[in-house]
């Protein structure tokens, strides 16, 4: 008798995988185990909850029980997996165990909180659960410090500013989105945030946080300090690899998988934010959707290597939206930038004259798909 497929996790990657499996096989036993409620919500919506006055419960799209009934699943919510015995094909919690034929790790990633004094005063917004824990504080806060000027930090800064809050955005780098693109490209967004009233503290590092009568005092390494009501860590995500380590599979930054989404153990796979696919961590929706399509085939006996085309990454900053694609982080590209009132096109060219990356904004985003077709990958 088939012991079926177990998926650990309940986020976007797990749900996409379930849907793709059920398109091909209505009956293979499917079990999902996760530490949260397993209710469905759209994680990117977390970047806009404050300006849209949404409570955590407003984000729920489908209850766990409805999902289980729709796709013929066994669900175990609020369940922490303690260990995996890869040789015996057994998943263990504190008081239960499950046998599997194939196991999929879809454990996601956790928000990194800088290891400074007072780090317990920092909030994170990496899940509906995390937002639920701090929504009252964030709604009531008037002065907000966001630590980290990457994708999420920039999105949150704009959202909190649109909600009428006093926002300070801090980053170690000299420009926003520094790990994604050069300053001459990100400067359009940077200037717009400044014009909106966001106070930028670039080339700045947080040293400590202290509770005061007036709120929270944030002290920088420079000894400059500011008083705020809430501090949000937007300093990146760390793939969740602890379970994979316990199972004895190879991990690096993420859970290492090949083009078949297979780990170093032949019956254990990984997908989504926790996975490192041939050396790349790709925590974006489109590669996860494609990964789910291919992994579903492979779990059901197929042998389909994942092929990822050039894909768009969308920066959800509504007043100055950006799309980017290609190797925008490369330092050896020559950038050709056309900036006009209706938007910007920035093309990153290699020494051989090939288009290796691009960033488009506002009304020029409609040109993104044509540029994708000419992108060298």
UniProtKB/Swiss-Prot annotation:
Alphabetical list of InterPro entries matching this protein: FAD-bd_OxRdtase, FAD/NAD-bd_sf, FAD/NAD-binding_dom, NO_rdtase_NorW, Rbx-bd
Compartments in which it is found: Cytoplasm
MF GO annotations: oxidoreductase activity, acting on iron-sulfur proteins as donors, NAD or NADP as acceptor
One GO cellular component term: cytoplasm
Pathway membership, UniProt: Nitrogen metabolism; nitric oxide reduction
EC main group: oxidoreductase
Catalytic reaction(s) noted: 2 reduced [nitric oxide reductase rubredoxin domain] + NAD(+) + H(+) = 2 oxidized [nitric oxide reductase rubredoxin domain] + NADH
The EC number(s) this enzyme carries: 1.18.1.-
UniProt cofactor(s): FAD
Oxidoreductase is among the record's keywords: yes
UniProt KW keywords: Cytoplasm, FAD, Flavoprotein, NAD, Oxidoreductase
Principal cellular location given in the protein's record: cytoplasm
UniProt family annotation: Belongs to the FAD-dependent oxidoreductase family.
Alphabetical list of HAMAP family matching this protein: NorW
Biological role: One of at least two accessory proteins for anaerobic nitric oxide (NO) reductase. Reduces the rubredoxin moiety of NO reductase.
Protein name: Nitric oxide reductase FlRd-NAD(+) reductase
Natural source organism: Salmonella dublin (strain CT_02021853)
């Amino acid at each position: 008798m088939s012991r079926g497929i177990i998926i650990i996790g309940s986020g976007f990657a797990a749900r996409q995988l379930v849907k793709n499996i059920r398109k091909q096989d209505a009956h293979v036993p499917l079990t999902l185990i996760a530490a949260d409620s397993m209710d469905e919500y759209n994680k990117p919506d977390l970047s806009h909850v404050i300006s849209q006055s949404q409570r955590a419960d407003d984000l729920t799209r489908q209850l766990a029980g409805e999902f289980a009934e729709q796709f013929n699943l066994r669900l175990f919510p609020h369940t922490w997996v303690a260990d995996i015995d890869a040789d015996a094909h057994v998943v263990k919690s504190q008081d239960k165990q499950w046998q599997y034929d194939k196991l999929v790790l879809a454990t996601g990633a956790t928000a990194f909180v800088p290891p400074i004094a007072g780090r317990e005063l920092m909030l994170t917004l990496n899940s509906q659960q995390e937002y639920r824990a701090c929504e009252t504080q964030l709604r009531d806060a008037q002065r907000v410090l966001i630590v980290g000027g990457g994708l999420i930090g920039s999105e949150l800064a704009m959202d909190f500013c649109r909600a009428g809050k006093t926002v300070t955005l801090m980053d170690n780098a000299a420009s926003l989105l520094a790990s994604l693109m050069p300053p001459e490209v990100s400067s359009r967004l940077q200037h717009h945030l400044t014009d909106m009233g966001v106070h930028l503290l670039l080339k700045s590092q947080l040293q400590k946080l202290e509770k005061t009568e007036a709120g929270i005092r944030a002290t920088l390494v420079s000894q400059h300090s500011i008083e705020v009501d809430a501090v949000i860590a937007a300093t990146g995500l760390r793939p969740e690899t602890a379970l994979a380590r316990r199972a004895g599979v190879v991990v690096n930054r993420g859970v290492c998988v090949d083009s078949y989404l297979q780990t170093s153990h032949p019956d254990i796979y990984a997908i989504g934010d926790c996975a490192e696919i041939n050396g790349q961590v790709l925590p974006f929706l489109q590669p996860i959707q494609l990964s789910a399509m291919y992994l579903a085939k492979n779990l059901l006996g197929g042998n389909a290597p994942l092929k990822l085309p050039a894909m768009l990454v969308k920066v959800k900053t509504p007043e100055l939206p950006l799309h980017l694609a290609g190797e925008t982080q490369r330092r050896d590209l020559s950038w050709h930038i056309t900036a006009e009132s209706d938007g910007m096109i920035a093309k990153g060219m290699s020494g051989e004259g090939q288009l290796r990356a691009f960033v488009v904004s506002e009304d020029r985003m409609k040109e993104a798909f044509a540029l994708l077709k000419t992108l060298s990958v």
